[in-house]
Amino acid sequence: LFTDAVLAASEYLDIRPVYIEKDYWITRSLKLMAQNPNSDKAIFKGGTSLSKAHKIGNRFSEDIDIAISDGDSLIGNRSKMLIKKIAKEMTYGLEEVVVQGVTSKGSRYYKAMYSYPNVLGRAIKETVNIGQLLVEINSFANPYPYVSKNIDCFIAQFFRKTNNEDLIEQYGLEGFSL
């Protein structure tokens, strides 16, 4: 059923299926982060946020960039603990893939690759890693100003545009504020 939704959304929106699938997993991770009690400190930023939140261009990226607001005010190990907690919660159910030269987990910076259950396969060469998400979180960027925006996935947009709103709720694809 998921594969059918990905392929139908791909055809309707004229976006390659691998990007529809990756968008679902990026949006899922962001939704998990938004449900975190510390989500008010986690600011979605970078190129992917321009596409997902601000609807500027169709950027198909593999990374989720997060900045911790007021990171300089976190004393001692609190920054690292907060970053680790947010990363763990937003990647729930995904498998970390340790990549030499990519994976980095410092006191103020976290960068790790995660694999998701890819239903479309890995045979197609793409500009992004099929079946993987890169999560980057830091507490030294200055994420100001920022504004909360509604986020949803391409599959939900497809369901909405084809008058299938009931499927959005049925499959838990409701938009959320971040």
Predicted feature residues:
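Glycine-/proline-rich flexible loop or hinge segments
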Residues: 8-14, 64-74
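Active-site nucleotide-donor binding segment shared across nucleotidyl transfer reactions
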Residues: 34-64, 69-70
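Short, low-complexity, polar/charged sequence segments that are solvent-exposed and flexible
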Residues: 62-64, 85-88, 153-158
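Short, compositionally biased low-complexity segments
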Residues: 1-6, 56-65, 129, 161-168
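Helical scaffold of the NTase/Pol beta-like nucleotidyltransferase catalytic core
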Residues: 1-43, 82-86
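Catalytic cores of NTP-dependent nucleotidyl/adenyl transfer enzymes across multiple folds
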Residues: 8, 27-31, 95, 99-178
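Metal-dependent nucleotidyltransferase catalytic core
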Residues: 68-104
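Short, conserved acidic/polar surface loops in the N-terminal third of protein domains
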Residues: 53-57, 76-81, 146-148
